[in-house]
Amino acid sequence: MSRRQVRRVGDSGSFPFVGALHSKSRSSPLLSVCLVLVGACLLIGYAYSGPGMFKSIREVSKITGDYSCTAEVQRAIPILKSAYGDSMRKVLHVGPETCSVVSSLLNEEETEAWGVEPYDVEDADSNCKSLLHKGLVRVADIKFPLPYRSKSFSLVIVSDALDYLSPRYLNKTVPELARVASDGVVLLAGNPGQQKAKGGELSKFGRPAKMRSSSWWIRFFSQTNLEENEAASKKFEQAASKSSYKPACQVFHLKPLH
């Protein structure tokens, strides 16, 4: 009965365009092409609907202009290994998206890695949830003392997180990072002029990112009695030059607290 109703609509002339389209669809490849395109879109949507969807979105946002020193850490791992050698054996990373950094470090030979995520991880994928369950990654407010003993790690790497702290909290947090390190601290900070956090990120970080100049950081280190590690800095620059690596973020090397 339904077929008859469809024919009557076409024959009655109420929808002549539908009838014309129906008569031409057999000979025209347009419909087939449209179906293929729709199918491709569905497949792409399915592929991105898995646990890695949030990571893919974050990667796209970085490509479109959002700065990310955490992504820079992963690029710099070979350079850091050349500069620090055995000091890369026990590494603590502090900063947003720490799960991705910890995973990359764990893939390196003779390297143990832990992470501190300063912000919520509601969109954590299965890999990050596994690291949290194992205790390799913790969620902690870095404005307060870190839950580790002094010199627990050979090297501490911090990225992105400090750009969202006011000087009041930096005075406490940076020395605290140096306290839990035995060999050194690597600090990656955004360059002045880089894009600041978007509206959605403001609700997560609490304040826009503050891009400070290298002279500001050097003055800050001096005021907080933190000493730059010139030997490590030189080795890092030499390794970067050999590999044609140009960091997109400012990189500072600090000595641990004695």
Curated annotation (Swiss-Prot):
Alphabetized SUPFAM superfamilies for the sequence: S-adenosyl-L-methionine-dependent methyltransferases
Localization, UniProt: Golgi apparatus membrane
Keyword Membrane: yes
Intervals, Lumenal compartment: 51-258
Cytoplasmic side stretches: 1-29
Enzyme Commission number: 2.1.1.-
GO molecular function term, any single one: methyltransferase activity
Keywords, ordered alphabetically: Cell wall biogenesis/degradation, Glycoprotein, Golgi apparatus, Membrane, Methyltransferase, Transferase, Transmembrane, Transmembrane helix
Function text: Together with CGR2, required for homogalacturonan pectins (HG) methylesterification in the Golgi apparatus prior to integration into cell walls, essential for general growth and development. Promotes petiole elongation. Impacts photosynthesis and respiration efficiency by influencing leaf mesophyll morphology and physiology; pectin methylesterification modulates both expansion and positioning of cells in leaves, probably by changing cell walls plasticity.
Family: Belongs to the class I-like SAM-binding methyltransferase superfamily.
Identification of the protein by name: Probable pectin methylesterase CGR3
The organism of origin for this protein: Arabidopsis thaliana
